[in-house]
Every structure is written in structure tokens, then in C-alpha cells.
């Protein structure tokens, strides 16, 4: 079962820059899928970096406020424990790969946490089968499509059985078909009771799986929408908020060239 996340008056600024996160308060329920959306540079990715612990340990800056995961303040969770608690999927999976072939990448986390050889084999096979990539275990990561690489990234996170998944624009390099398939993976993780936080521009593939959507502007949460509210949001308001339309067909229509007129 996933863990709840409680964020209180969170503010963060990168060294030498203004606030990237501004007084954010947010409660994420255990087993919930939430989407952080908004214009580029609004602070979505920075908020995910606080939740997964990359801020302030890998990204320096000024951090204030509180964040709790389950019953523990995040700062009291050791880095090794945090790595097992939170699985990460990034925009470009190559940025998180440590091995050259699929099996080695999925096994990497298990090896770091001292799993036995038999446990590693079992976890790798289960994660690969779950993501339907068992036929790729001996393949080089460099030969795979972006869609397959994202499946490997999910499998490598899933192998250590985290309770929380944090994803930063995971569909950015995927085509429409691969994006919908990625949505199926999220749906399956939700069915397992995992807590999932997704920073994303594309919304259409999440409309039937996300529980809530949070619009972020200038580092602050300015609007919260239920799934039903997001689906029924007027196009004019979507545009005003700087969001992409959650309706794929409407998006395709908007991108069509205008008919020539005399």
C-alpha cells in the first residue's frame, strides 16, 4: 500500500534565483494518483524533486516548510531508506540508467539493497513480466525505443517495491500510442495501491486514472480539480491557465492547419 504525503508551507529557491516553489501546502492520500500541471517553468519538477528527496541533497538552494511521508518527516528518512520508498521515473530514462543491458538495469537497485542472488533473479523477472519486457532482458538499452526505455525505468523502480512513484514528465518523448500504453502502466500501479505523483504537460492519457489535478503557476498551487472537473473544464479556461487540453481529439483539431480561404 502506498504512503500518504503531507506538505506544509513549502518554499524553495535554487541558489541565486527567486522562489521556484512558493508556500505550497498539499495533502496526498495513500494510493492516490495526483497530477501537477502548469506552464513550463512553473515549479512542477521542483516540487517532485522535494518529494523524492533530490532537493536539497542534489539541488542546492533555500528550503523551508515541512514534508512528511507516512508518519515521518522527510528529513528523518535516511537516503538509503528514501531510495527504497520512492521510485522515480524521469522525462528521459537514459538519465537514470546505470547499466548497459535491460536485466542489469532492473537488477541495479536490488543489488544496492543487498538482495540475495535468488531474490534479485525473482524480482527482475517479476518486474519484467509485469511490464511485458521479459523478452528484452538481454537487450542493450541503447537499442530500445523511448517507450521501451520508459518500461525499463518503471521495471527498475518496481523491482525494489516502492510505495510511492514520482514521475517527471514521463510521456515527453513518447508518441501517442506509447503514451496511452504508459497510462496503462500507471493504472496497474494504482491498482496495487501505490501513491503516484506525476508532473506532466500532457493530460489526455491521465484523465481516467488521476484522482486530482493541481495547476501550478509561479511556484504556487492556484487551482485544484477533481477528475470530473478537469474533464468538464471549458477550453477558454484551460487556455487561461496555460494548460494543454485534456481532450486528445480537440488538441488534434487545434493543431490542424486552417483551411485556405479566397
Predicted regions and their residues:
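Conserved ABC ATPase "signature" region
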Residues: 118-136
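Catalytic Walker B motif of ABC-type/P-loop ATPase nucleotide-binding domains
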Residues: 165-168
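Conserved ABC ATPase signature
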Residues: 140-144, 148
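A short, flexible loop at the N-terminus of ABC-type nucleotide-binding domains that lies
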Residues: 1-7, 12-23, 55-60, 78
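ABC ATPase NBD Q-loop/coupling interface
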Residues: 66-81
